[in-house]
């Protein structure tokens, strides 16, 4: 996309690995992190006139020669097209993408939506005192060589969490900080 499009903006959601941003920038693109949710990504793509976007969930959107919505068959065909234009294998193409250590998406149930939003407000105040944070969607806390994301679920009374580090040691360290704070909320079920 970056080779053929005049618009270099690529939209991706807050749950994506730091490798996404790094790869976009290395390839000459403009990385725009946005809120999680396929409709939110699509709307941001329209606003930015972006030809490509994606989410950690696997929703991938092409808008350069297509309608700008997620379509697995179309994405597969575009991948086949890319592979047909090179002598490299898919493994060789993606071999330069950095690899990080991360948790799967974790969900911590709250009693109700009100508690979910109260906890998120408190988490934001707590972490912003100590760390650099992004509040695009929830709170993304940058700790050492990684980050922890805490956000209110769009569909349930739950806090959604994802953590990433450059190494297993970094990941474990960030998990300890995030989980230590989450454990102070007596009504949140923390199971991991």
Question: Where do the model's predicted regions map?
Answer:
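Phosphate-binding and adjacent anionic-ligand microenvironments
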Residues: 6-192
